[in-house]
């Protein structure tokens, strides 16, 4: 099937299948959805316009935030003031990143090596998360996760979900310095640090055309010490804000979207998201991350090595 705006011929079934893969990985691992979307657009389907690829990547990564945000809010799994600070920084960063990328990285010959370097970095980060050192550092965080998950299960079984607010995110102090409790544990953070992080992450993610979860999640878990149970919801809300800003800015600068092409991919992403929600609990997350780290490392090399005359 010919997609005139994208300027490529592609089998709709292939688009759907790739979308399923992207949706599954993004939902089950929580990272690399935008990177995989970009690989599909550039290497599998042959899109040649870098400024078309970037917003199309980000649109595919919006499925999970759009679906997940209301659910996370209902379960009190979003640190709203944190998400707002990240989102405000993200708006500024997304405008800067997309504007610079639209002019400086408009050609594939400059965009792909940049994309590859960041992909290599992401692969190394995911590989690190598979090590015993990283898993041991997350034991205290896991305790809060397990406490909250057990309580949610108990409240659901007894029909008392209205009591969830007692153990969910509850703020004691909001401002530059913030304090909140979650699952009986207290957490503190600086709002300015969060804003600056949101800005920097959005500059990078908007310039690449990805969501930014690969940086936000490690920041909140490793630097801020937040439990993963609230990190997921907080990150998807901020990604929703920054990615939407980036997409709109690319469009305002003249980037085009092949909506027919995207429709097939989005259908696949939706299917992959649902499948991951149902079956990912039966698949060893560490093995999945190890596989993804290897795939991303290869992809990164594929885009970087041509700089020194090597093609793989």
Task: Give the positions of each predicted feature.
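Membrane-interface alpha-helices at helix entry/exit sites of multi-pass transporters
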Residues: 49-56, 81-85, 225-236
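Small-residue-rich packing faces within the transmembrane alpha-helices of Major Facilitator Superfamily
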Residues: 62-65, 123, 240-243, 297-300
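Hydrophobic transmembrane alpha-helices of secondary-active solute transporters
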Residues: 22-26, 201-206, 242, 246, ...
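Juxtamembrane transmembrane-helix boundary motif
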Residues: 1-23, 42-43, 50, 71-201, ...
